[in-house]
Each structure stands twice: as structure tokens, then as C-alpha cells.
Design a protein with these regions (language model features):
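Catalytic loop of short-chain dehydrogenase/reductase
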Residues: 29-30, 68, 72-99, 104-113, ...
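Rossmann-fold cofactor-recognition segment
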Residues: 1-5
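A short helix-coil junction within the Rossmann-fold of NAD(P)-dependent oxidoreductases
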Residues: 17-18, 31, 35, 62-71
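Short, flexible catalytic-loop segment of classical short-chain dehydrogenase/reductase
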Residues: 123-133
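Substrate-binding pocket helix/loop in short-chain dehydrogenase/reductase
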Residues: 35-37, 41-49
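A short, exposed helix-loop element centered on a Lys and neighboring polar residues
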Residues: 60-61, 105
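Active-site "substrate specificity/gating" loop of NAD(P)-dependent dehydrogenases
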Residues: 40, 86-90, 131
């Protein structure tokens, strides 16, 4: 999800073919390296923010008009428990997920007077590659 030009063009391409979008589910995320913030590589920090936050902002900009063309549009964004808890060593990932949640909540409030249903989903512990990367000793 860090192909910003592709994301920006996505809305137009969907419009050309279908004119609307009924549902969006955004699950794009990368973990980055867990560790002290002062040890986090700048490029990796920015990459995590770009994938987990900035790409979703661009996606919202690209597809909101398409969602509004639908009868009962829905947009859901997957988040994480670390978005709501301050945990050491989770740096860019936690920051990006907390920021994503705030952005989605703001977008939801901005669309309160229309029929666009916007939600944040926290799936909890899920046996994924990212979960195994973050918790290598955990039994899944």
C-alpha cells in the first residue's frame, strides 16, 4: 500500500468500471522493527507511517466519492490493541495505528449526516505472519 500514485488513481479506475464502491476493508499494515524509539531507523519509521497511515489517507481521498455513490456504503479499517495502549518498544507501529484510528474517527464524524458507515475493527489476537513476528514465542 505504499504505491501512492496507484492509490490516487484507484478511485478513477473503479469509477470508470462500476461508478460506485459498496464496501472498503483496509487491512494494509507493516510492523517494522520493535525496539526503543531512539534505535528505530528513520527510513523504516517513515515506511511504517506511510503504509499504515498515509496510504489510508490517500485511499480515503480516492474512494470517498465512490462510496457516496452507493446505497449503503461501508468502510472498515483494521487496527490493533496497541493503538489504545502505550507500550514501550512498539514505536512506529503503535503511533501509526493510533493515528489511523483518530483519522478514521474524524472521517466518520465528518460523514455523520450521510449514509456512509465507517468503522474500526480490532480483530484481537490473530494467527498472522505479523503476529508471529511480533510475538515469536507465543503459541498460536
Amino acid at each position: 500500500m505504499n504505491n501512492f500514485i496507484g492509490i490516487d488513481k484507484l478511485g478513477l479506475e473503479i469509477f470508470k468500471r462500476w461508478k460506485k464502491l459498496d464496501i472498503l476493508i483496509s487491512n494494509a499494515a507493516i510492523l517494522g522493527t520493535l525496539g526503543p524509539i531512539h534505535h528505530q531507523n528513520n527510513d523504516e519509521f517513515i515506511e511504517v507511517l506511510n503504509v499504515n497511515l498515509v496510504s489510508n489517507h490517500r485511499l480515503i481521498r480516492s474512494i470517498e466519492p465512490l462510496l457516496k455513490n452507493s446505497v449503503q456504503p461501508k468502510a472498515s479499517f483494521l487496527s490493533s490493541t496497541v493503538a489504545n495502549e502505550v507500550r514501550p518498544f512498539w514505536g512506529a507501529y503503535a503511533i501509526s495505528k493510533a493515528s489511523l484510528q483518530h483519522m478514521v474517527k474524524i472521517w466518520s464524524l465528518e460523514n455523520k449526516k450521510n449514509n456512509l458507515s465507517i468503522s474500526i475493527i480490532n480483530p484481537g489476537k490473530t494467527n498472522t505472519k505479523m503476529r508471529r513476528q511480533a510475538f515469536p514465542g507465543e503459541n498460536n
